[in-house]
Swiss-Prot record:
Compositional bias segments (type: Polar residues): 12-24, 87-101
Coiled coil: none
Region ranges (Disordered): 1-42, 60-107, 146-177, 214-369
Ranges annotated as biased composition (Acidic residues): 155-169
Gene source species: Dictyostelium discoideum (Social amoeba)
Annotated Low complexity bias: 30-42, 70-86, 219-324
Protein name in the entry: Putative uncharacterized protein DDB_G0275317
Length: 369
């Protein structure tokens, strides 16, 4: 350490302008008086003086009182308490002349080392700790997710199923309105039949009146259908009237049967229950027959018109051919393949062989010749 300090002093030299970097070593074994009296030293130093640009040492509280071992009056605590502060400089502890040589050597070596380090003027900068922005202050909070959910929580599937049900014909209001009304009318007809069965014991006349109302309604339907047929000039009014008369006769026969049954019930009081039940069944059968006749009246009238026209009027073949019949049109369309294009199935393929137009024209020309 001493060799390094001497080499440093030789390189820098005492005549350098930067005097703070120059350290003059005191002679070994010399005391403070010799240092002050040495005229060879360019810088007069006093032991314990604070060097410029250095920090002050922290002096513990024990060293500031009479327990300081470096104090000159360490053994005389009672007499020299006031002089204890004079031995302690600002921040440093100065050994006194009463110290032994070993303590002086240790103090001189430590002071030389510290002076050398201070002479280097090394600035130590302590940067403020920077917070790492990449590291989060707290751990992420886990969010529990249910692995299994109830059937009611799956809104998407329930919506899809409802939409699929809505697209079906059974739930479509536009397409199934007529079928819904039809089911209601059938249910009402069954209810009316059950009411007839249950109430014929005391209200047999009501069943007959309801039958008459149904027959009148049936006659009104016949009149409306006949009016529609009269709009067609090719229909035969006489045949329509005959059909109406026949239907009315059937209704009258039904009414007569009901009246006969009622008379029999009056004559035989013991068989009232059975006859009333028979009347109810007859009324239900009549209502079903009326509904069947009502459903097929248009077809029967049209077929009767055609048959009567063929039998009675042999000269009206042209008029009969003008009567529109859907089934006849479809048959003619299928058979007449020479003038109509072939029908196509669901895949777009023709069922019949395609005939080019020039062949059709040639065939037609050959027929004319």
């Amino acid at each position: 350490m001493r060799a390094a300090l001497e080499e440093y002093n030789q390189k820098v030299g005492p005549n350098n302008n930067n005097q703070s970097n120059t350290i003059n070593l005191p002679p070994v074994g010399s005391n403070s008086n010799n240092i002050n009296d040495n005229n060879n030293n360019s810088i007069q130093r006093k032991r314990g003086a604070t060097v410029i640009g250095t920090r002050e040492f922290h002096v513990p509280s024990d060293l500031k009182n009479h327990h300081n071992p470096y104090h000159s009056n360490y053994n005389n605590n009672n007499n020299n308490n006031n002089n204890s502060s004079s031995a302690i400089t600002s921040g440093t502890v100065a050994p006194s002349s009463s110290m032994n040589n070993h303590q002086k050597e240790d103090d001189s070596y430590t002071s030389l080392k510290m002076r050398y380090l201070r002479s280097l003027n090394i600035s130590i900068k302590q940067e403020a700790p920077t917070k790492d922005t990449n590291v989060s202050a707290s751990a992420p909070i886990p969010i529990p997710i249910a692995l299994s959910m109830g059937r009611g929580d799956l809104d998407s599937e329930s919506d899809i199923s409802e939409k699929e049900d809505d697209n079906d014909g059974s739930f479509d209001g536009n397409s199934s309105g007529n079928s819904f009304l039809k089911h209601n009318t059938i249910a009402n007809s069954y209810l009316s039949g059950n009411q007839f069965k249950n109430n014929l014991n005391s209200y047999a006349g009501n069943g007959i009146n309801s039958m008459n109302s149904l027959s009148s309604h049936f006659n009104n339907n016949n009149n409306s259908s006949n009016n529609n047929n009269n709009n067609n000039p090719n229909n035969n009014n006489n045949n329509n009237n005959n059909n109406n008369n026949n239907n009315n006769n059937n209704n009258n026969n039904n009414n007569n049967n009901n009246n006969n049954n009622n008379n029999n019930n009056n004559n035989n009081p013991n068989n009232n229950k059975n006859n009333n039940n028979n009347n109810g069944s007859n009324i239900i059968n009549n209502s079903s027959n009326i509904s069947k006749n009502n459903g097929f009246i248009m077809k029967s009238n049209s077929s009767n018109n055609i048959d009567n026209n063929n039998n009675n009027n042999n000269n009206n073949n042209n008029n009969n051919s003008n009567i529109y019949n859907k089934e006849d049109d479809e048959e003619q369309f299928d058979l007449d393949t020479s003038t109509t294009p072939p029908r196509k199935d669901s895949k777009g393929k023709g069922k019949h062989k395609f005939i080019p137009p020039h062949e059709l024209l040639g065939a037609a020309g050959g027929d004319d010749d």
